[in-house]
A protein has these predicted regions:
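Short, contiguous acidic and Ser/Thr-rich linear segments
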Residues: 79-84
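A short, aliphatic-rich alpha-helical micro-motif
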Residues: 14, 110, 437-438
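Short, small-residue-biased leader/transition segments that mark boundaries at the very start
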Residues: 4-21
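Fe-S ferredoxin-like electron-transfer domains
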Residues: 44-46, 52-65, 114-297, 301-305, ...
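Intrinsic disorder at enzyme termini
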Residues: 19-68, 327
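A basic, amphipathic helix-loop patch mediating RNA/tRNA/ribosome contacts
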Residues: 87-121
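Catalytic alpha/large subunits of respiratory electron-transfer oxidoreductases
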Residues: 164, 168, 215, 222, ...
Length: 471
Protein backbone atom coordinates (compact mmCIF):
# COMPACT_ATOMS: atom_id res chain seq x y z
CA UNK A 1 0.00 0.00 0.00
CA UNK A 2 1.47 3.39 -0.92
CA UNK A 3 2.52 5.53 2.05
CA UNK A 4 0.21 8.26 3.23
CA UNK A 5 1.32 11.73 2.11
CA UNK A 6 3.02 13.75 4.85
CA UNK A 7 0.92 16.34 6.66
CA UNK A 8 1.94 19.69 5.15
CA UNK A 9 3.09 22.53 7.33
CA UNK A 10 1.25 25.82 7.52
CA UNK A 11 3.98 27.64 5.58
CA UNK A 12 3.86 25.03 2.82
CA UNK A 13 0.09 25.40 2.54
CA UNK A 14 0.44 29.16 2.23
CA UNK A 15 3.05 28.87 -0.53
CA UNK A 16 1.14 26.25 -2.50
CA UNK A 17 -2.16 28.07 -2.13
CA UNK A 18 -0.54 31.32 -3.27
CA UNK A 19 1.03 29.64 -6.31
CA UNK A 20 -2.26 28.05 -7.37
CA UNK A 21 -4.31 31.21 -7.05
CA UNK A 22 -1.71 33.30 -8.83
CA UNK A 23 -1.99 30.96 -11.81
CA UNK A 24 -5.79 30.89 -11.65
CA UNK A 25 -6.19 34.61 -11.02
CA UNK A 26 -8.41 33.68 -8.07
CA UNK A 27 -8.84 36.02 -5.12
CA UNK A 28 -11.64 34.41 -3.09
CA UNK A 29 -11.08 32.65 0.20
CA UNK A 30 -8.90 29.54 -0.08
CA UNK A 31 -10.95 27.88 2.67
CA UNK A 32 -14.19 27.98 0.69
CA UNK A 33 -15.69 24.59 -0.29
CA UNK A 34 -13.61 23.06 -3.05
CA UNK A 35 -11.02 25.82 -2.91
CA UNK A 36 -8.20 23.50 -1.87
CA UNK A 37 -8.91 20.83 -4.49
CA UNK A 38 -6.21 22.08 -6.93
CA UNK A 39 -3.56 21.64 -4.26
CA UNK A 40 -1.63 18.51 -3.42
CA UNK A 41 -3.73 15.56 -2.25
CA UNK A 42 -2.05 15.57 1.14
CA UNK A 43 -3.62 18.92 2.00
CA UNK A 44 -7.00 17.34 2.71
CA UNK A 45 -5.58 15.95 5.95
CA UNK A 46 -4.63 19.49 6.93
CA UNK A 47 -7.95 21.25 6.41
CA UNK A 48 -9.31 20.80 9.95
CA UNK A 49 -6.01 21.80 11.57
CA UNK A 50 -5.68 24.83 9.32
CA UNK A 51 -9.16 26.06 10.26
CA UNK A 52 -8.04 26.24 13.88
CA UNK A 53 -5.57 28.97 12.90
CA UNK A 54 -8.44 31.25 11.88
CA UNK A 55 -9.56 33.43 14.78
CA UNK A 56 -13.32 33.74 15.14
CA UNK A 57 -14.02 32.54 11.61
CA UNK A 58 -12.17 35.51 10.05
CA UNK A 59 -9.77 34.50 7.31
CA UNK A 60 -6.69 36.80 7.09
CA UNK A 61 -6.21 35.83 3.43
CA UNK A 62 -9.71 36.87 2.30
CA UNK A 63 -10.65 40.18 0.67
CA UNK A 64 -8.48 39.75 -2.38
CA UNK A 65 -5.51 38.44 -0.43
CA UNK A 66 -5.26 41.51 1.83
CA UNK A 67 -4.74 40.81 5.54
CA UNK A 68 -5.46 43.03 8.49
CA UNK A 69 -2.68 44.22 10.75
CA UNK A 70 -2.92 42.34 14.05
CA UNK A 71 -2.86 44.30 17.30
CA UNK A 72 -0.77 42.94 20.16
CA UNK A 73 -0.16 44.13 23.71
CA UNK A 74 3.39 44.36 25.09
CA UNK A 75 3.86 45.48 28.70
CA UNK A 76 0.55 47.30 28.70
CA UNK A 77 1.06 49.08 25.37
CA UNK A 78 -0.91 48.24 22.24
CA UNK A 79 0.99 47.93 18.96
CA UNK A 80 -0.05 47.30 15.37
CA UNK A 81 2.36 44.89 13.69
CA UNK A 82 2.74 43.24 10.32
CA UNK A 83 0.96 39.93 9.92
CA UNK A 84 2.98 36.80 9.24
CA UNK A 85 5.86 37.87 11.48
CA UNK A 86 7.06 36.34 14.71
CA UNK A 87 7.22 38.30 17.94
CA UNK A 88 10.98 38.91 17.75
CA UNK A 89 10.69 40.45 14.28
CA UNK A 90 7.76 42.55 15.46
CA UNK A 91 9.71 43.83 18.48
CA UNK A 92 12.74 44.72 16.37
CA UNK A 93 10.56 46.58 13.87
CA UNK A 94 8.97 48.51 16.75
CA UNK A 95 12.34 49.45 18.24
CA UNK A 96 11.85 47.34 21.38
CA UNK A 97 14.94 45.77 22.94
CA UNK A 98 14.67 41.98 22.88
CA UNK A 99 17.99 40.09 22.86
CA UNK A 100 18.58 37.22 20.43
CA UNK A 101 21.40 35.12 19.00
CA UNK A 102 20.24 32.30 16.72
CA UNK A 103 17.69 34.28 14.67
CA UNK A 104 18.92 35.78 11.41
CA UNK A 105 16.74 37.65 8.89
CA UNK A 106 18.00 35.51 6.01
CA UNK A 107 17.76 32.17 7.81
CA UNK A 108 14.81 32.49 10.15
CA UNK A 109 14.43 30.97 13.60
CA UNK A 110 15.23 27.67 15.28
CA UNK A 111 14.88 28.64 18.96
CA UNK A 112 18.33 27.31 19.85
CA UNK A 113 19.69 30.10 22.03
CA UNK A 114 16.55 30.65 24.20
CA UNK A 115 17.59 34.28 24.55
CA UNK A 116 14.48 36.00 23.18
CA UNK A 117 12.28 34.65 25.98
CA UNK A 118 9.11 36.57 26.81
CA UNK A 119 6.05 35.87 28.92
CA UNK A 120 2.80 35.26 27.05
CA UNK A 121 -0.58 35.54 28.79
CA UNK A 122 -3.74 33.73 27.69
CA UNK A 123 -5.98 36.71 28.41
CA UNK A 124 -6.22 39.85 30.53
CA UNK A 125 -7.14 37.80 33.63
CA UNK A 126 -4.10 35.53 33.38
CA UNK A 127 -1.60 36.55 36.08
CA UNK A 128 1.01 33.80 35.67
CA UNK A 129 1.63 33.49 31.96
CA UNK A 130 4.13 31.15 30.37
CA UNK A 131 7.59 31.66 28.96
CA UNK A 132 7.80 31.38 25.17
CA UNK A 133 10.52 32.15 22.65
CA UNK A 134 9.86 35.33 20.69
CA UNK A 135 11.42 33.99 17.49
CA UNK A 136 9.13 30.94 17.54
CA UNK A 137 5.90 32.73 18.46
CA UNK A 138 3.78 34.14 15.61
CA UNK A 139 1.95 37.37 16.29
CA UNK A 140 -1.82 37.00 16.51
CA UNK A 141 -4.47 39.61 17.04
CA UNK A 142 -5.08 40.29 20.73
CA UNK A 143 -1.99 38.46 22.01
CA UNK A 144 -0.56 39.72 25.31
CA UNK A 145 3.17 39.63 26.07
CA UNK A 146 5.60 40.92 28.67
CA UNK A 147 9.22 41.76 27.86
CA UNK A 148 10.17 43.81 30.90
CA UNK A 149 8.63 41.61 33.60
CA UNK A 150 10.84 40.03 36.26
CA UNK A 151 10.01 36.53 35.05
CA UNK A 152 11.16 37.20 31.47
CA UNK A 153 14.21 39.25 32.45
CA UNK A 154 15.33 36.69 35.02
CA UNK A 155 15.09 33.91 32.45
CA UNK A 156 17.12 35.86 29.88
CA UNK A 157 19.79 36.71 32.47
CA UNK A 158 20.13 33.05 33.41
CA UNK A 159 20.57 32.11 29.75
CA UNK A 160 23.36 34.66 29.25
CA UNK A 161 25.01 33.52 32.48
CA UNK A 162 25.01 29.92 31.25
CA UNK A 163 26.46 31.00 27.90
CA UNK A 164 29.27 32.82 29.67
CA UNK A 165 30.28 29.83 31.83
CA UNK A 166 32.85 28.63 29.30
CA UNK A 167 33.31 31.85 27.36
CA UNK A 168 36.82 33.32 27.68
CA UNK A 169 37.25 36.85 28.96
CA UNK A 170 39.43 37.90 26.02
CA UNK A 171 37.38 40.82 24.70
CA UNK A 172 40.40 43.20 24.70
CA UNK A 173 42.25 40.93 22.25
CA UNK A 174 39.28 39.47 20.36
CA UNK A 175 38.98 40.61 16.75
CA UNK A 176 35.22 40.95 17.22
CA UNK A 177 35.60 43.46 20.06
CA UNK A 178 33.54 46.58 19.54
CA UNK A 179 31.08 44.95 17.14
CA UNK A 180 30.36 41.73 19.03
CA UNK A 181 26.71 40.77 19.21
CA UNK A 182 27.36 38.79 22.39
CA UNK A 183 28.78 41.89 24.06
CA UNK A 184 25.72 43.91 23.12
CA UNK A 185 23.23 41.30 24.29
CA UNK A 186 25.11 40.68 27.56
CA UNK A 187 25.00 44.37 28.38
CA UNK A 188 21.33 44.52 27.37
CA UNK A 189 20.26 41.83 29.86
CA UNK A 190 22.42 43.29 32.64
CA UNK A 191 24.77 40.35 33.26
CA UNK A 192 27.98 41.53 34.95
CA UNK A 193 29.51 39.07 37.43
CA UNK A 194 30.46 35.44 36.95
CA UNK A 195 29.41 33.25 39.88
CA UNK A 196 30.83 30.02 38.51
CA UNK A 197 34.39 29.34 39.68
CA UNK A 198 34.92 25.93 38.11
CA UNK A 199 37.15 24.98 35.21
CA UNK A 200 36.00 25.97 31.73
CA UNK A 201 35.68 23.65 28.78
CA UNK A 202 38.34 24.36 26.17
CA UNK A 203 38.60 23.32 22.54
CA UNK A 204 41.38 22.96 20.02
CA UNK A 205 41.10 25.43 17.16
CA UNK A 206 41.37 24.38 13.52
CA UNK A 207 43.18 25.77 10.52
CA UNK A 208 40.44 26.76 8.07
CA UNK A 209 42.59 28.45 5.45
CA UNK A 210 44.39 31.76 4.97
CA UNK A 211 41.24 33.89 5.14
CA UNK A 212 39.27 32.79 8.22
CA UNK A 213 40.51 32.40 11.79
CA UNK A 214 38.90 29.81 14.08
CA UNK A 215 38.53 30.32 17.86
CA UNK A 216 36.11 27.66 19.08
CA UNK A 217 36.32 28.60 22.76
CA UNK A 218 34.14 31.66 22.08
CA UNK A 219 31.22 29.64 20.70
CA UNK A 220 27.75 30.03 22.25
CA UNK A 221 26.12 27.22 20.21
CA UNK A 222 23.68 29.36 18.23
CA UNK A 223 24.08 27.17 15.10
CA UNK A 224 24.19 30.20 12.81
CA UNK A 225 27.41 29.00 11.16
CA UNK A 226 26.19 25.55 10.12
CA UNK A 227 22.73 26.82 9.19
CA UNK A 228 24.32 29.32 6.84
CA UNK A 229 27.18 27.18 5.55
CA UNK A 230 25.28 23.94 4.99
CA UNK A 231 21.64 24.93 4.59
CA UNK A 232 21.95 28.33 2.90
CA UNK A 233 25.27 28.21 1.02
CA UNK A 234 25.24 24.48 0.28
CA UNK A 235 28.65 23.71 1.81
CA UNK A 236 29.41 20.22 3.08
CA UNK A 237 32.74 20.48 4.90
CA UNK A 238 31.61 22.34 8.05
CA UNK A 239 29.36 20.67 10.59
CA UNK A 240 28.27 20.49 14.22
CA UNK A 241 30.19 17.68 15.90
CA UNK A 242 29.76 15.97 19.31
CA UNK A 243 26.86 16.88 21.61
CA UNK A 244 25.71 18.47 24.85
CA UNK A 245 28.40 20.58 26.49
CA UNK A 246 31.03 19.48 23.97
CA UNK A 247 29.44 20.62 20.70
CA UNK A 248 32.14 21.56 18.20
CA UNK A 249 31.65 23.53 15.00
CA UNK A 250 34.36 22.76 12.48
CA UNK A 251 35.64 20.31 9.90
CA UNK A 252 36.26 16.60 10.36
CA UNK A 253 39.86 17.37 9.42
CA UNK A 254 41.72 20.64 9.28
CA UNK A 255 41.81 22.30 5.89
CA UNK A 256 40.66 25.18 3.76
CA UNK A 257 36.90 25.73 3.69
CA UNK A 258 35.69 24.76 0.22
CA UNK A 259 32.70 27.07 -0.17
CA UNK A 260 33.03 30.19 -2.31
CA UNK A 261 30.94 31.99 0.32
CA UNK A 262 32.74 30.91 3.49
CA UNK A 263 33.76 34.49 4.28
CA UNK A 264 30.21 35.31 5.33
CA UNK A 265 30.84 33.26 8.47
CA UNK A 266 32.75 36.30 9.74
CA UNK A 267 29.57 38.38 9.77
CA UNK A 268 27.07 35.60 10.47
CA UNK A 269 28.78 34.51 13.70
CA UNK A 270 27.54 36.66 16.63
CA UNK A 271 30.80 36.17 18.54
CA UNK A 272 34.46 35.84 17.59
CA UNK A 273 34.56 32.17 16.56
CA UNK A 274 35.10 33.02 12.88
CA UNK A 275 37.08 36.19 12.24
CA UNK A 276 38.87 37.82 9.33
CA UNK A 277 42.41 36.45 9.31
CA UNK A 278 43.64 39.23 7.03
CA UNK A 279 43.38 41.59 10.02
CA UNK A 280 45.76 39.57 12.20
CA UNK A 281 48.94 41.49 11.34
CA UNK A 282 47.41 44.96 11.00
CA UNK A 283 44.39 44.77 13.25
CA UNK A 284 42.15 47.81 13.56
CA UNK A 285 39.15 48.28 15.80
CA UNK A 286 35.84 49.13 14.19
CA UNK A 287 35.69 52.61 15.70
CA UNK A 288 39.07 53.47 14.17
CA UNK A 289 37.96 52.65 10.63
CA UNK A 290 36.81 55.22 8.12
CA UNK A 291 34.02 53.50 6.17
CA UNK A 292 31.98 54.62 3.20
CA UNK A 293 29.39 52.87 0.99
CA UNK A 294 30.80 51.35 -2.18
CA UNK A 295 30.09 48.87 -4.97
CA UNK A 296 32.05 45.68 -5.61
CA UNK A 297 33.64 45.60 -9.07
CA UNK A 298 34.47 41.88 -9.02
CA UNK A 299 31.61 41.02 -11.38
CA UNK A 300 28.57 42.56 -13.04
CA UNK A 301 26.21 42.00 -10.09
CA UNK A 302 27.39 45.13 -8.30
CA UNK A 303 27.08 43.96 -4.70
CA UNK A 304 26.85 46.72 -2.13
CA UNK A 305 29.88 46.82 0.16
CA UNK A 306 31.21 48.78 3.10
CA UNK A 307 35.02 49.03 2.87
CA UNK A 308 36.93 50.21 5.92
CA UNK A 309 40.15 52.26 5.68
CA UNK A 310 42.79 53.47 8.12
CA UNK A 311 46.10 55.26 7.51
CA UNK A 312 45.41 55.26 3.78
CA UNK A 313 45.12 51.46 3.51
CA UNK A 314 42.11 49.24 3.00
CA UNK A 315 41.63 47.06 6.07
CA UNK A 316 38.51 45.07 5.30
CA UNK A 317 35.34 44.85 3.21
CA UNK A 318 31.97 44.09 4.80
CA UNK A 319 28.60 43.49 3.27
CA UNK A 320 26.18 46.40 2.94
CA UNK A 321 22.57 45.25 2.86
CA UNK A 322 20.60 45.81 -0.32
CA UNK A 323 17.51 43.64 -0.72
CA UNK A 324 17.45 43.98 -4.52
CA UNK A 325 21.12 43.17 -5.15
CA UNK A 326 23.09 41.13 -2.62
CA UNK A 327 20.95 40.93 0.50
CA UNK A 328 23.01 40.00 3.55
CA UNK A 329 25.88 38.15 1.87
CA UNK A 330 28.95 38.57 -0.35
CA UNK A 331 31.12 36.10 -2.19
CA UNK A 332 34.70 35.55 -1.01
CA UNK A 333 36.07 37.29 -4.09
CA UNK A 334 34.24 40.46 -3.20
CA UNK A 335 35.14 40.23 0.50
CA UNK A 336 38.80 39.25 0.30
CA UNK A 337 39.75 40.10 -3.29
CA UNK A 338 40.40 43.82 -2.89
CA UNK A 339 43.80 43.56 -1.23
CA UNK A 340 45.56 44.61 -4.43
CA UNK A 341 44.70 48.23 -3.67
CA UNK A 342 47.31 48.14 -0.89
CA UNK A 343 50.13 47.08 -3.25
CA UNK A 344 53.32 49.12 -3.03
CA UNK A 345 53.44 49.14 -6.85
CA UNK A 346 50.12 50.92 -7.09
CA UNK A 347 50.19 54.65 -7.79
CA UNK A 348 49.03 56.51 -4.71
CA UNK A 349 49.18 60.04 -6.14
CA UNK A 350 48.98 61.68 -9.60
CA UNK A 351 52.18 62.68 -11.34
CA UNK A 352 53.81 63.55 -14.65
CA UNK A 353 56.63 61.55 -16.20
CA UNK A 354 59.33 63.86 -17.57
CA UNK A 355 61.53 63.24 -20.61
CA UNK A 356 64.48 62.32 -18.41
CA UNK A 357 62.41 59.67 -16.59
CA UNK A 358 61.63 61.67 -13.47
CA UNK A 359 58.15 61.29 -12.02
CA UNK A 360 57.00 64.63 -10.64
CA UNK A 361 54.06 64.62 -8.24
CA UNK A 362 51.06 66.80 -9.00
CA UNK A 363 48.01 67.71 -7.00
CA UNK A 364 44.63 66.64 -8.36
CA UNK A 365 43.81 70.04 -9.85
CA UNK A 366 47.12 70.20 -11.73
CA UNK A 367 46.68 66.61 -12.90
CA UNK A 368 43.24 67.33 -14.36
CA UNK A 369 44.54 70.41 -16.15
CA UNK A 370 47.41 68.40 -17.63
CA UNK A 371 45.01 65.65 -18.75
CA UNK A 372 42.77 68.19 -20.46
CA UNK A 373 45.76 69.68 -22.27
CA UNK A 374 46.97 66.27 -23.49
CA UNK A 375 43.49 65.13 -24.55
CA UNK A 376 42.89 68.34 -26.50
CA UNK A 377 45.91 67.51 -28.67
CA UNK A 378 44.08 64.49 -30.10
CA UNK A 379 47.07 62.22 -29.47
CA UNK A 380 45.65 60.44 -26.40
CA UNK A 381 43.40 57.39 -26.51
CA UNK A 382 41.41 56.02 -23.61
CA UNK A 383 40.83 52.31 -22.97
CA UNK A 384 38.00 51.54 -20.58
CA UNK A 385 37.50 48.41 -18.52
CA UNK A 386 34.49 46.19 -17.77
CA UNK A 387 35.87 45.96 -14.23
CA UNK A 388 35.53 49.71 -13.72
CA UNK A 389 32.26 51.41 -12.92
CA UNK A 390 30.00 52.81 -15.64
CA UNK A 391 30.65 56.30 -14.30
CA UNK A 392 34.43 55.91 -14.52
CA UNK A 393 34.24 54.65 -18.11
CA UNK A 394 31.91 57.48 -19.07
CA UNK A 395 34.20 60.13 -17.60
CA UNK A 396 37.16 58.67 -19.48
CA UNK A 397 35.16 58.70 -22.72
CA UNK A 398 34.08 62.27 -22.04
CA UNK A 399 37.68 63.33 -21.51
CA UNK A 400 39.30 61.72 -24.56
CA UNK A 401 36.31 61.97 -26.91
CA UNK A 402 34.13 59.33 -28.55
CA UNK A 403 36.54 58.71 -31.46
CA UNK A 404 39.50 58.08 -29.14
CA UNK A 405 37.75 55.80 -26.65
CA UNK A 406 37.70 51.99 -26.64
CA UNK A 407 35.47 50.12 -24.17
CA UNK A 408 38.13 47.56 -23.26
CA UNK A 409 36.56 44.41 -24.69
CA UNK A 410 36.38 42.76 -28.10
CA UNK A 411 33.95 43.46 -30.89
CA UNK A 412 32.17 40.15 -30.24
CA UNK A 413 31.57 41.11 -26.63
CA UNK A 414 30.39 44.53 -27.77
CA UNK A 415 27.82 42.87 -30.05
CA UNK A 416 26.60 40.69 -27.19
CA UNK A 417 26.28 43.67 -24.87
CA UNK A 418 24.37 45.63 -27.52
CA UNK A 419 22.03 42.69 -28.14
CA UNK A 420 21.40 42.20 -24.43
CA UNK A 421 20.71 45.90 -23.97
CA UNK A 422 18.28 45.89 -26.90
CA UNK A 423 16.43 42.87 -25.48
CA UNK A 424 16.18 44.51 -22.09
CA UNK A 425 14.83 47.79 -23.45
CA UNK A 426 12.63 46.62 -26.32
CA UNK A 427 11.28 43.25 -25.24
CA UNK A 428 9.47 41.67 -22.32
CA UNK A 429 12.72 40.35 -20.91
CA UNK A 430 13.46 41.54 -17.37
CA UNK A 431 16.54 41.58 -15.17
CA UNK A 432 15.45 39.75 -12.01
CA UNK A 433 16.71 40.79 -8.60
CA UNK A 434 18.02 38.38 -5.98
CA UNK A 435 14.62 37.87 -4.34
CA UNK A 436 13.02 37.02 -7.69
CA UNK A 437 15.71 34.46 -8.49
CA UNK A 438 15.40 32.84 -5.07
CA UNK A 439 11.64 32.39 -5.49
CA UNK A 440 11.70 31.29 -9.15
CA UNK A 441 9.88 28.08 -10.11
CA UNK A 442 12.27 27.24 -12.96
CA UNK A 443 15.63 28.63 -14.07
CA UNK A 444 17.38 28.05 -17.40
CA UNK A 445 21.14 28.69 -17.65
CA UNK A 446 22.75 28.64 -21.10
CA UNK A 447 26.47 27.91 -21.32
CA UNK A 448 27.59 29.89 -18.29
CA UNK A 449 29.59 29.10 -15.17
CA UNK A 450 27.62 31.30 -12.78
CA UNK A 451 29.87 30.60 -9.81
CA UNK A 452 32.83 32.19 -11.59
CA UNK A 453 31.11 34.96 -13.53
CA UNK A 454 28.50 36.06 -10.96
CA UNK A 455 28.98 34.26 -7.63
CA UNK A 456 26.20 36.09 -5.80
CA UNK A 457 23.72 34.93 -8.44
CA UNK A 458 24.94 31.36 -7.89
CA UNK A 459 24.09 31.69 -4.20
CA UNK A 460 20.61 32.90 -5.13
CA UNK A 461 20.19 29.90 -7.46
CA UNK A 462 20.97 27.61 -4.54
CA UNK A 463 18.13 29.23 -2.61
CA UNK A 464 15.72 28.63 -5.47
CA UNK A 465 16.54 24.91 -5.50
CA UNK A 466 16.45 24.77 -1.71
CA UNK A 467 13.10 26.56 -1.43
CA UNK A 468 11.46 24.30 -4.01
CA UNK A 469 12.73 21.25 -2.12
CA UNK A 470 10.85 22.41 0.97
CA UNK A 471 7.52 22.70 -0.84
Amino acid sequence: RPPRPPRPTLSRVRRQRSDVYKRQGNTHCALAPGAMEPLASGLKYFREDFLRHIDGGHCPWCSGGASEMPHIHIDGQEYEVESGKNLLEACLSLGLDLPYFCWHPAMGSIGACRQCAVVQYQNAEDQRGRIVMGCMTPVTDGAIFSLAGDKAQGFRQSIVESLMLNHPHDCPVCAEGGECHLQDMTVMVGHRDRRYRGRKNTHRNQYLGPLINHEMNRCITCYRCTRYYRDYAGGTDLAALASHDHVYFGRHQEGVLQSEFAGNLVEVCPTGVFTDKSLVHEYTRKWDLQSAPSICTGCAVGCNTLPGERYGKLKRVHNRFNAEVNGYFLCDRGRFGAGFVNSDKRLSYPGLRQVDGRYDALDHHQALQEMQRLCASGKVAGIGSPRASVEANFLLQLMVGDDSFAPGFSGTEQTLVTTALDLQQNSRAVVPDIATIESADAILILGEDITNTAPRIALALRQSVRNKAYE
